[in-house]
Amino acid sequence: PNQGTASADYIASKGLATKVAVIYNSSDAYSSGIYDNFKAEAAAKGLDLVASEAFTGDSKQDFSSQLSKIKASGAELIFLPIYYQEASLILSQAKNAGITAKFFGCDGLDGLLNIENFDKSLAENVMLLTPFAANATDETTKKFVAAYNAKYDPSTLNQFAADAYDAVYIVKAAAEKAGVTGDMSVSDICNALKGAMTEITVDGVTGSGMTWKATGEVNKEPKAVKIENGEYQPMD
């Protein structure tokens, strides 16, 4: 959910738009949680939320109704706190509808460029906040990217791969903090890990100094990137 707050802050601070619309998945906790935080922060930052359009897991193919309302609203930017599969359809349908608004998303959009047969030109200038950018120049990222590309298909490298890599070491750090041993029951291990997660700080590929709340929400700084010529480029 904190991605919603960060996205509203970034859009407002960079002057990307004043009239903003949102398309979100009301049946998904990730999407609706980000939307709720975005809505609150957008109001605090003076952004005009001119349209909020929802869909559900059962209605994620045809977005013509949502896009028609958004086009009529005069939105300058459309915020997409959703996953890349639905985003690819929205981008295609938005083009067909003659929508020229900017698009901005969160880490769920990472993977958009890897969709089979997706026209990458539809994603040109799409902006998003993500915890991982493969072309970052810090040593941690460079080492991870080199190791990943040596073993796997480089075209599959995205923030989900980086998240999975970090997750292994995060659980390891929590297990060590909790003193987990092999003779403990599964329920005891789970309870021990939940307690330890709020006490550890982890440096990883997707963030430095990562910490966790009791709710499981992670605290880490996302990176802003824009898709240009089929590649992620860092933004200020």
Language model: regions and residue ranges:
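Extracytosolic ligand-binding ectodomains
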Residues: 1-236
